[in-house]
Structures are given as structure tokens and as C-alpha cells.
């Protein structure tokens, strides 16, 4: 632990946290400063020029990262009939209707994404107090309430990231892992940021993207110089 702290202290001493970093240098510093024995996530926090107290300025959406997030995504699917076979073939870990709802209530099964066919929403809405706070409530805008169960599962498994601003107008998301190639992290970030830009509400005035910070799970957080972006 002392060796780790000593190395981290040196890294922090060598980094100017007041500086705005170009995207390539920023990613390089995050990778260089990683000093834990697990594959850290690369996270982004985007401070938006919105009023989160006004419902017409809140942002919610999703996008598919070209290189995925680097984690094994467990999917729960609320559906019935022929869709059960489709969901199994597509790789969903948990599938069902009332029985799946009971599993969630009583066993507290863990998953990263919940998908539902429209005819299952009566059951899903009963789980609002459980799924809502965890950001797992299926939503048509996110493509997680759909008749195309196969596509929704594929998207979730291959890098779909759902996002929404918090009460402070900040969006948080994971866009990769520390062992990704620099260009992979950069391409994931560019796709994510482009999605946020497209989601700008008309009611938002002034500077929309105020600040962008990239960080690793246990490492440093650095502020991006937005002039270095090509999008």
C-alpha cells in the first residue's frame, strides 16, 4: 500500500490539475497513472448548461459505443411467448414475466439492463420503486421497451450506454476500460459526446457543455480542453 501511495503521490505531483488537457494527452495520463491490480473503468462527467429543475431541460438518451464498455452486461427481459426463445438465443440472463418480477422482489437478482416487450409493461411498472432508483426502468426512448427483443439485447451486450442528467445537471457514464487502446477510448468518447450534443433541449440557453472531466475508477480526474475535439 505504501508503494502505491508513493507512486500515486509522485504522479499527482507531476500533473497540473488546473490545466485543460487535449483528449489524447488526457487519455495517456489516465493510462499512465493507473496503479491498481484490476481493469479500471474510464468514466466521464459532463456538466451541462441546463436547469435540471425544469422537466423540459432534462436529458435522457442512449447511444452505442463502437468498442463497448468492456464489461460483461447481464440482461433481464420481461416478455412471453415466442420472444422467450428469441431472448434466450440472444443471450439474456434472466427472462420471464410475473416469475421474473418475483425473483427481483424476493431474491434481489443483479443485472445491468432491463428490457421489456410492450405487453409486459403492466408487470414492469409494479417494480418502479426497485428499478427506478437503479436507473433500470425500461423506457421506449432508450429502446428498452420494444417489440424487437433480439436487437435490444444485442445493443445492450455490445455497448449501449444509457444516460440521464442528475439533479445538478451532470451526466455520468462509463465509456471504456483502462486496458483499451487510446484510439478506442477516444472513439467511444466522441460517439458519446456527439449523442449528448444531439440531445440538447431547445430551452437550454447559453453554453451547453460547460465542463468535461474524464477519470479512472481509482485514479485521477482531468478536465478536457474542448478545443481539441473534432466533433
From Swiss-Prot:
Residue ranges that the Swiss-Prot or TrEMBL entry lists as coiled coil: none
Gene designation per UniProt: rplA
Protein purpose: Binds directly to 23S rRNA. The L1 stalk is quite mobile in the ribosome, and is involved in E site tRNA release. Protein L1 is also a translational repressor protein, it controls the translation of the L11 operon by binding to its mRNA.
Alphabetized Gene3D superfamilies for the sequence: 3.30.190.20, 3.40.50.790
Pfam families hit by this protein: Ribosomal_L1
Protein family: Belongs to the universal ribosomal protein uL1 family.
Subunit structure: Part of the 50S ribosomal subunit.
InterPro entries for this protein: Ribosom_uL1_bac-type (IPR005878), Ribosomal_uL1 (IPR002143), Ribosomal_uL1-like (IPR023674), Ribosomal_uL1/biogenesis (IPR028364), Ribosomal_uL1_3-a/b-sand (IPR016095), Ribosomal_uL1_CS (IPR023673)
Keywords for the protein's UniProt record, in alphabetical order: Repressor, Ribonucleoprotein, Ribosomal protein, RNA-binding, rRNA-binding, Translation regulation, tRNA-binding
GO MF assignments: rRNA binding; structural constituent of ribosome; tRNA binding
Claim: Transport is one of the keywords in the record: no
Any one Gene Ontology BP term: regulation of translation
Naturally occurring in which organism (per UniProt): Buchnera aphidicola subsp. Schizaphis graminum (strain Sg)
Gene Ontology CC annotations of this record: cytosolic large ribosomal subunit
CDD domains: Ribosomal_L1
Protein name: Large ribosomal subunit protein uL1
Amino acid at each position: 500500500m505504501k508503494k502505491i501511495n508513493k507512486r500515486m503521490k509522485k504522479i499527482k505531483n507531476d500533473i497540473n490539475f488546473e490545466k485543460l488537457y487535449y483528449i489524447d494527452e488526457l487519455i495517456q495520463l489516465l493510462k499512465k497513472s493507473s496503479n491498481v491490480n484490476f481493469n479500471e473503468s474510464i468514466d466521464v462527467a459532463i456538466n451541462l448548461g441546463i436547469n435540471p429543475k425544469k422537466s423540459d431541460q432534462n436529458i435522457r438518451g442512449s447511444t452505442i459505443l463502437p468498442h463497448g464498455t468492456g464489461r460483461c452486461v447481464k440482461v433481464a427481459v420481461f416478455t412471453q411467448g415466442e420472444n422467450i426463445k428469441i431472448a434466450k438465443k440472444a443471450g439474456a440472463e434472466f427472462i420471464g414475466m410475473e416469475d421474473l418480477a418475483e425473483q427481483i422482489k424476493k431474491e434481489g437478482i443483479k443485472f445491468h439492463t432491463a428490457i421489456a416487450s410492450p405487453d409486459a409493461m403492466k408487470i414492469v411498472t409494479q417494480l418502479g420503486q426497485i428499478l427506478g432508483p437503479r436507473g433500470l426502468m425500461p423506457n421506449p426512448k432508450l429502446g428498452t421497451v420494444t417489440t424487437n427483443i433480439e436487437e435490444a439485447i444485442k445493443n445492450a451486450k455490445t455497448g449501449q450506454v444509457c444516460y440521464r442528467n442528475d439533479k445538478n445537471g451532470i451526466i455520468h457514464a462509463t465509456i471504456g476500460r483502462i486496458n483499451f487502446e487510446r484510439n478506442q477510448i477516444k472513439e467511444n468518447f466522441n460517439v458519446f459526446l456527439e449523442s449528448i450534443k444531439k440531445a440538447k433541449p431547445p430551452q437550454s440557453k447559453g453554453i451547453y457543455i460547460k465542463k468535461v472531466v474524464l477519470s479512472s475508477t481509482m485514479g485521477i480526474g482531468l478536465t478536457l480542453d474542448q478545443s481539441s475535439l473534432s466533433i
